[in-house]
Amino acid sequence: MHNTIYVLGFRHQTTPASVREKLAFSPENILNTLPFLQAQCAGAEILLLSTCNRSEWYFASNTPPRLEEWLYQHTAISSEELKRHLFIYTDREAVQHLYRVACGLDSLILGEPQILGQLKAAYRLAKKAGSIGSWLERLFQHSFALAKHVRHQTDIGKNPVSVAYAGVQLTHQFFDDYSKRTAIIVGAGETAQLVARYLHDLKIKRLIIANRTLNRAQQLAESVGGYALSLPQLADHLHEADMIFGCARADVFLVTQNMAITALQRRQNTLQVYIDLGIPHNFDRNIDNKENAFLYDMDNLAQLIDKNRETRQKAAAEAETFIRLYSNDFLNWTQEKPQQHMIRHIRADAHNIRQKLLIMAYRQLAQGADPEKVLAEMSYKLTNKLLHQPCALIHAIPPDHKDWLAVVADTFNAELPK
C-alpha cells in the first residue's frame, strides 16, 4: 500500500505563544493520544512532536488525516485560531520540513541542537505507543542521519546557542556584574539545566532552583552550587531574586501578579526581570505592567534571536543542499515497487543467516576443529535455514490450489507430481 507523508501543525513563526500553549502535550498525554488518534485515522502511522515552539503531527497514511476534527474535540483551540495558524505539508514539502526541523534550520535560534534531542524523544514515545511503522521508521532514521551529517559537514553547530542562552543573554540589558546577583530558576528539566549552566558560568552569586519535585531541584542545585526549593516555597523567596527564569511545564501561573507585587514590596521596589521560557506561560503576563518588573516571554525572545541568525545563514544554505539530496533518496524509496521492498527484505534475512553461521564457523576453526567438517556442517545448516520458510509455505498450500503450486514449482524449477 502506497502512503503519503503528511505534516500538520503549529510553529513559532506563524503561531503566537498564547495559541501554542493550548497545544502543549506532556509525554503522558502523547502516549495516551497516539493510539486513539491512530484508530481515528484508519491505522495511519503517527508521531507527535510537542515542544515550547511547535506542536507537529507527522503521518504516513494512504488517506488525508482528520486532525482538525480531533483538535476541535480535544484541545482548547478555536476554529478561527486553527484556520489561521495550522500548516499542512505533503510529500516532498513534508519530508523537507522534517529534515529542516532535525537540522535546527526551522528553530527559533537557527542551528540550535536541542530540537534533535526533542525529536528523538518524540520518536521513542511513538515507538512505545506502537504508532510508527516502516514508513515513519525510515523517515525519522533518515532525519537523524542527516542532522548528524550536517553537524559534521557545515558550521551550523558552531558558537552554540539556545532559547536558554538567549534568555540569559537578555538579562545583560539590566545587569553587568552577576557576582552580585541572585537568580531563581523554576523547573529542573533540560531548559532549566541549560539556564543554570549559563548562569553558573557567569559567576552568579546565588542560584535557587524551585521545582515541583524537590529531589530533582536538589540534583540540579548540587551540580551548579545552588539551593533547592519546592514550588510551595517559591512565593516566600521570590523577593530575593534579581532575575527569575520560568522553565517548567504547568497548567497554571507559577508566579502570579500578586506574588510579584509582594516580592517587589519586600525588596523596596528594586528591579526584577522575569524571563518566561515556559509553554504554557509560567508567569502572569500582567507582571509586566508593574513598575520595576520586566517580563519577557518566547515571543519577545524571537526578536532578540533574529540578530543571531546572520552568523549561521551560510551554513544553513549548505545544509539545504544535503536536505535536497536526502529528500530525493527517501522519496525514491517511497516510489519503489512492493516487490523491491520484499526482495531487499529477503536478501537481508539471507545475509543475516549467512553471517551468523560464518561467525560460528570461525569460532570452531579458532578452537582447532577440522575445517572440512566445519564447512560441511555450515553448508548443511545454511541450506536448511534458507529453505525452511519456502518449504513451510509449500506445506501450507491446499492440494486443490493447483495454480499456486504451479507458481511455486516454476519459481524453484521443480516438477509437479502427475
From Swiss-Prot:
- What Pfam families would the database entry show? GlutR_dimer (PF00745), GlutR_N (PF05201), Shikimate_DH (PF01488)
Give the matching PROSITE patterns: GLUTR
Classify the source by domain of life: Bacteria
Q: Which residues bind substrate?
A: 51-54, 107, 112-114, 118
**InterPro entries on file:** 4pyrrol_synth_GluRdtase, 4pyrrol_synth_GluRdtase_dimer, 4pyrrol_synth_GluRdtase_N, GluRdtase_CS, GluRdtase_dimer_dom_sf, GluRdtase_N_sf, NAD(P)-bd_dom_sf, Shikm_DH/Glu-tRNA_Rdtase
At what residues does the UniProt record annotate the site feature described as Important for activity?
Answer: 97
Entry binding sites for NADP(+):
187-192
Catalysed transformations (reactions):
(S)-4-amino-5-oxopentanoate + tRNA(Glu) + NADP(+) = L-glutamyl-tRNA(Glu) + NADPH + H(+)
Instruction: Provide the active-site residues from the annotation.
Output: 52
Gene3D superfamilies attached here?
Glutamyl-tRNA reductase, N-terminal domain, NAD(P)-binding Rossmann-like Domain
> Which keywords does the record carry?
NADP, Oxidoreductase, Porphyrin biosynthesis
Q: Which family does it belong to?
A: Belongs to the glutamyl-tRNA reductase family.
What is said about its interaction partners and assembly? Homodimer.
Q: Relate the protein's function as given in its record.
A: Catalyzes the NADPH-dependent reduction of glutamyl-tRNA(Glu) to glutamate 1-semialdehyde (GSA).
Tell me the HAMAP family matching this sequence: Glu_tRNA_reductase
State the name under which the record lists this protein. Answer: Glutamyl-tRNA reductase
Task: Please tell me the species this chain comes from.
Answer: Dichelobacter nodosus (strain VCS1703A)
Gene that encodes the chain: hemA
